[in-house]
């Protein structure tokens, strides 16, 4: 390329031409760097694809169980329902993670341990974990101050301040059993505790642990506690525990024997975990009279908390909580609390909801005393029915 090609006359100074060449050189250098960067990126992508292709071409591995570690390089493994082998351990396997009972991948040719597999769990057990923290707080519970204090001392305090128990020299409670009539706030207390404590909350209903085939219920209980240990700190909440914790009888059917196996596994798991650890268990029932005595002894459920029907003061607190966002006009909550003797917390919530529905039915934006009177009649029924409910609760719960 000459001076004439770029339009510069021979008589002109060569400085402009030199500046043009320098600018052109910078442009070419920039293009070279861009192409080199693209080349490196494509080489990395090619390397990744080759590695992926190499992995896909590898033969499948056997799944087995680690039985025993012999030394740093050898172990005894067992293929599922097969013989046992003394095999080598691949150098890239972290030895501290190899424990008896762990699931491992075995090479097809040499049977060497080439990978540590995650523990096997039933999908239903994984579904017990509550991902979203409940929105219920302690302020949403009325009339249960004493019960909340006992629950927080037994569950929340050991998780947040374990050093207090070490200084005093005692072991914290392993578990808490909440018992009382239906609708009195047992499940609500557990939800509030999960909201306040920064821990994994695992909720399961007792009937979900009852299975048709032999050994399935016991396996679910074992995997439930294994999940809690992996997710620690964790709280296991078993609602309606009487479904698996009823008293064992001498004469049983096949289904009852399976329930008894599930109960025995639960007892074994509760005996097995450390009370000073980060796993706590809460259970709830409205039939404490039918629970197996082995479940209630100290060392399993160390604290039994009764959640009774609310008295007048408690009913007034519950009504204030449920009506704090309602537009009331001329409503005396003390009268409502006096008229609802024998009602549970769930009944009181239903009464406030029905009172609001009566106001909406009349196209009003406020709730009156008359609305509450109608709601009491609808929810609790006649005085005779109400007295029958009170008598039934007294017979059942004393």
Curated annotation (Swiss-Prot):
Keyword Ribosomal protein: no
Keywords: ATP-binding, Chaperone, Coiled coil, Cytoplasm, Nucleotide-binding, Proteasome
Region (Docks into pockets in the proteasome alpha-ring to cause gate opening): 396-398
Any one Gene Ontology molecular-function term assigned to this protein's record: ATP hydrolysis activity
Record text about domains: Consists of three main regions, an N-terminal coiled-coil domain that may assist in substrate recognition, an interdomain involved in PAN hexamerization, and a C-terminal ATPase domain of the AAA type.
NCBIfam families from the UniProt entry: PRK03992.1, proteasome-activating nucleotidase
Family: Belongs to the AAA ATPase family.
Protein name as catalogued: Proteasome-activating nucleotidase
């Amino acid at each position: 390329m000459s001076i004439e090609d770029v339009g510069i006359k021979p008589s002109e100074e060569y400085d402009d031409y030199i500046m043009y060449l320098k600018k052109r050189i910078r442009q070419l250098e920039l293009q070279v760097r861009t192409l080199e960067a693209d080349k490196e990126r494509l080489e990395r992508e090619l390397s990744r694809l080759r590695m992926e292709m190499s992995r896909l071409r590898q033969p499948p591995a056997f799944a087995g169980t680690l039985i025993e570690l012999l030394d740093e390089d050898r172990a005894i493994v067992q293929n599922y329902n097969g013989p046992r082998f003394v095999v080598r351990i691949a150098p890239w396997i972290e030895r501290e993670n190899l424990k008896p009972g762990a699931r491992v991948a075995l090479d097809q040719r040499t049977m060497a341990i080439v990978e540590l597999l995650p523990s096997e769990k039933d999908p239903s057990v994984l579904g017990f974990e509550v991902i979203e923290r409940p929105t219920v707080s302690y302020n949403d519970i009325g009339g249960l101050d004493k019960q909340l204090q006992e629950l927080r001392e037994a569950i929340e305090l050991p998780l947040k301040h374990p050093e207090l128990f070490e200084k005093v020299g005692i072991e914290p409670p392993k578990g808490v059993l909440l018992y009382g009539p239906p609708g009195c706030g047992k499940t609500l207390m557990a939800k509030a505790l999960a909201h306040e404590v920064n821990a994994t909350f695992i909720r399961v209903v007792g009937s979900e642990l009852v299975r048709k085939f032999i050994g399935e219920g016991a396996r679910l209980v074992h995997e439930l506690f294994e999940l809690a240990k992996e997710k620690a700190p964790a709280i296991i909440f078993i609602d309606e525990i009487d479904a698996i914790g009823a008293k064992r009888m001498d004469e049983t059917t096949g289904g009852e024997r399976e329930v008894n196996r599930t109960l025995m596994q639960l007892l074994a798991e509760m005996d097995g975990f450390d009370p000073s650890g980060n796993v706590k268990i809460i259970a709830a029932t409205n039939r404490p009279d039918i629970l197996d005595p082995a479940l209630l002894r100290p060392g399993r459920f160390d604290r039994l908390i009764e959640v009774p029907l609310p008295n007048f003061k408690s009913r007034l607190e519950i009504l204030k909580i449920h009506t704090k966002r309602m537009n009331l006009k001329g409503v005396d909550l003390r009268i409502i609390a006096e008229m609802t003797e024998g009602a549970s917390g769930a009944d009181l919530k239903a009464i406030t909801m029905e009172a609001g529905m009566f106001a909406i039915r009349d196209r009003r934006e406020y709730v009156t005393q008359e609305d509450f009177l109608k709601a009491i009649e609808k929810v609790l029924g006649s005085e005779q029915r109400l007295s029958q409910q009170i008598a039934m609760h007294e017979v059942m719960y004393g």
